[in-house]
Amino acid sequence: MGCVVSKSDDIKNENESRQRNQASSSQQPSSSQTPSKQIGIAAKDSEEQPQEVSYSQMRELDNDFFKDIIDRTAQKFIDVSMVGPDGKDSFLDREKDYSAQIKDSKLLKPTSLTSLPRLSQQCQMSNLQNLLSQPTTFDNELMSKYTSSISENLNGIHIKECGELVVFFGNSLK
């Protein structure tokens, strides 16, 4: 690059590459932005030319698509308000059984839920890391207080009838 001949060769090569780039870009149509596609509609292979759609039309098409989803979902709901008196009796029996099961289940060792690990017999208290990793007395008291509070609240749960709960498991949006 230090001599005059190589500098003129460099300029010549730049001009040639610039001309090639301009020729190739003039042959290819340039598009600065890709067209928008509607949500939920798969692109067809036969569509080579993108359809020009205004923003408001795209918004209306998307709203129609979402409205269709909502309508199909509404058709799949189960109306439990039409349950006859026979269904209500079985519901009351199930509610009583469930309530009795919860009342009968007691937490025998509430501290085992949130207890912290203990030092094994093999660990020596002279080991500073093991000594410092032990919980403080305040932490132990705090954890036991919260554990007993949680245990009391769980054992005192009262269940009242609120109605049937229906959950549909399946492909409801297909």
Curated annotation (Swiss-Prot):
Lineage: Eukaryota, Amoebozoa, Evosea, Eumycetozoa, Dictyostelia
Biased composition (Basic and acidic residues): 7-19
Low complexity bias spans: 20-38
GO cellular component annotations of the record: autophagosome; lipid droplet; Ragulator complex
Positions of region (Disordered): 1-55
UniProt record, GO biological process: cellular response to amino acid stimulus; positive regulation of MAPK cascade; regulation of receptor recycling
Organism: Dictyostelium discoideum (Social amoeba)
Name listed for the protein in its UniProt record: Uncharacterized protein DDB_G0292160
Highest taxon above the source species: Eukaryota
Lipidation (N-myristoyl glycine): G2
Keywords, comma-separated and alphabetical: Lipoprotein, Myristate
